[in-house]
Design a protein with these regions (language model features):
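Conserved PLP-binding catalytic core of the aspartate aminotransferase-like
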Residues: 301-311, 316-352, 367, 374-376
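PLP-dependent enzyme catalytic core of the Aspartate aminotransferase-like
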Residues: 55-58, 62, 66-70, 74, ...
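N-terminal "arm"/small-domain region of PLP-dependent enzymes with the aminotransferase-like
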Residues: 2-3, 12-75, 208
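Active-site PLP attachment segment
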Residues: 224, 230-265
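Conserved PLP-anchoring active-site segment centered on the Schiff-base-forming lysine
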Residues: 122-142
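PLP-dependent aminotransferase class I/II
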Residues: 248-315, 320-323
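Active-site phosphate-binding strand-loop segment of PLP-dependent enzymes
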Residues: 54, 156, 160-212
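Conserved N-terminal alpha-helix of the aminotransferase class I/II PLP-enzyme fold
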Residues: 65-113
Length: 404
């Protein structure tokens, strides 16, 4: 059998639909963010990155860079093994203590990515707890969906951000069910924020565990960057808080926080933790410094919110359709996969602006978008240039000026 023919047929379909993904080859440069060097031979040598998840530019912060450099000099490059076999470094334990403190929990546990932390934790909870039923928000991230699927626990989908529907679904479950309510704080593609207080109240009413993904909120919200749960004063009422080190903290890795028994349970049974090499100590050291900095500093968050507000106001003024939400994520709606790809290509090649088109399956068909994430290091001149480019392209590509 010619397997390549099978592969190529499905890739061909993706391309015809306009959903084939093309990666921009960039080279981040210390001290220059959001500018980056592009290795596209047909485009400009320098581009402005408008879609990074390094939301606060902490991956470029001098203290974070120095912490990683110092740790490499002291510890070398790799962890040397799994956490179970020679791979638990002092830097890992220090970072876990920093994370537990961030969320006001007894313990924390590190993973190699936010995807893995969700997948490993949810699959372990669902498979090991008796009569487990996981109630999942309809728009939960793929990592949560895959973890739930892998657990083989009973799954109940509740309407997105709808506590009343969650209440009905919980009430219909048998009394002996171990109920786990899984949801996010900030949803990455629409940028909406969950009605967390209402969800927590419903879960408590039915004796359910709460599993909260704060991936797009940690570092960004709350007086110390503890996320939306900290900002609302709800962290102590949530059973498990999951987050990432790869977005606002600018490094890489994922984690969970919770009670000591909960974290020990996941540590002891989660295959995604047990059977993989630990994060490099230098990564852990840099992440700890980034978290500690954002616990104290408000400057990055304040500047970032100011730039988000400025861009939203400018888009409103020129009628560029974008989703109205209270978060830092600005989805500009195109609603056509081919045009979305074309817009991104022209922005890159003609204007030196890099934004990745977001198409199916990341978002539903017909909701294709350009997802902008203004940061504290974007200048007012960067915003002016982006708005000028979007104004030009909306006319050139005949896209409607309408409310998203």
């Amino acid at each position: 059998m010619d397997f390549d023919t099978l592969f190529e047929a499905q890739i061909k379909t993706l391309k015809e639909e306009g959903n084939y993904r093309i990666f921009a080859e960039l080279e981040r440069q210390v001290g220059a963010f959001p500018k980056a060097r592009s290795h596209d031979p047909d485009g400009p040598e320098e581009v402005t990155v408008w879609c990074s998840n390094d939301y606060l530019g902490m991956g470029q912060h001098p203290k974070v860079v120095k912490a990683m450099q110092d740790a490499v000099g002291a510890c070398g490059c790799g962890a040397g093994g799994t956490r179970n076999i020679s791979g638990t470094n002092h830097q890992h334990k220090q970072l876990e203590a920093e994370l537990a403190d961030l969320h006001g929990k007894e313990a924390a546990l590190l993973f190699t990515s936010g995807y893995v932390s969700n997948w490993a934790a949810l699959s372990t909870l669902g498979s090991r707890l008796p009569n487990a039923v996981i109630l999942s928000d309809a728009l939960n991230h793929a990592s949560m969906i895959e973890g739930i699927r892998h657990s083989r626990a009973e799954k109940v989908i509740w309407k997105h951000n709808d506590p009343e529907d969650l209440d009905r679904k919980l009430a219909a479950l048998p009394a002996n069910a171990t109920k786990i309510v899984a949801f996010e704080s900030v949803y990455s593609m629409d940028g909406d924020i969950s009605p967390m207080a209402e969800i927590v109240e419903v879960a408590e009413k039915h004796g359910a565990m709460t599993y909260l993904d704060e991936v797009h909120a940690v570092g960004m919200y709350g007086p110390r960057g503890g996320g939306v749960s900290e900002e609302l004063g709800l962290a102590d009422r949530i059973t498990l808080i999951e987050g990432t080190l790869g977005k606002a903290y600018g490094v890489m890795g994922g984690y969970i926080t919770g009670s000591e028994p909960l974290c020990d349970f996941i540590r002891s049974f989660a295959s995604g933790f047990i059977f993989t090499t630990a994060l490099p100590p230098a990564v852990a050291a840099a992440a700890r410094v980034s978290i500690a900095h954002l616990k104290q500093s408000q400057m990055e968050r304040a500047r970032q919110r100011m730039q988000v507000r400025k861009l939203r106001e400018r888009l409103n003024a020129i009628g560029i359709p974008h989703l109205d939400n209270p978060s830092h994520i600005i989805p500009v709606m195109v609603k056509d996969p081919v045009k979305c790809r074309q817009l991104a290509d022209i922005l890159m090649q003609d204007f030196g602006i890099y934004v990745q088109p977001i198409n199916y399956p990341t978002v539903p068909k017909g909701t294709e978008r350009l997802r902008f994430t203004p940061g504290p290091l974007h200048s007012d001149e960067d915003i002016d240039h982006l708005v000028m480019a979007l104004t030009t392209l909306w006319k050139r590509c005949a896209i409607a000026h309408a409310v998203a």
